[in-house]
Amino acid sequence: AAAERPDDDSLRIYRMQEIEVTATRATEKTPVAFSNLSHDEIARNSYGFDIPSLLALTPSMIATNETGIGIGGTSIRLRGTDATRLNVTVNGVSMNNPDSHSVYWYDTPDLISSVGSVQVQRGAGISTNGTGAFGGAVNMTTAPIGTDFSGEASLSYGSYNTNKQAVRISSGLLGDHWV
């Protein structure tokens, strides 16, 4: 039987050009104090912590946690400035609430396992980071996706019976296309 032709009102497929996601990062020539956390540093230090607790590994960053275990209820300060004066981005997209300019870290409980690198800029920083970057900026980029099939599983256990289970599976390229 011959394949039926879809109706005129059915979904149409359009091929688009490649989209590249970029993020603004400070370099050695940029007149701003900054620190970078590589993927290896993040992987080595992220067990049992949320992102704000990991950020406390950088100079001038302080994290306080209401729960006492480093997960949830964590707030940050950079050079004494509260989090509402820090611009936080993932792949260049702001995570700050447009109303209060806070970042609700509760909404991203496992983002840390997808982060490839982090740059913390101390001070006003690069002006492209928006008006909220008065105190500084936290720029995160996600880890690159591989072209081959891959998988990863991890289990973590910590104080006060805290635990984390994570599974990541990547199809890679299928038929020379991303799925």
Regions found by a protein language model. Name each.
Residues 52-94, 116:
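Extracytoplasmic beta-strand/coil segments of soluble accessory domains associated
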Residues 94-122, 141:
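Short acidic/polar hinge/loop motifs at secondary-structure boundaries
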Residues 54, 79, 121, 141, ...:
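Transmembrane beta-barrel domains of outer membrane proteins
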Residues 100, 113-116, 127-179:
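Outer-membrane beta-barrel translocator/receptor signature
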Residues 2-44, 83:
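Short, acidic, small-residue-rich periplasmic hinge/interaction motif at the N-terminus
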Residues 34-51, 76-81, 157:
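Short, polar/charged loop or turn motifs at beta-strand boundaries
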Residues 16-18, 29-34, 58, 73, ...:
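Extracytoplasmic
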Residues 27-28, 64, 85, 95-97, ...:
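Short beta-strands and strand-coil junctions in structured, solvent-facing domains, enriched
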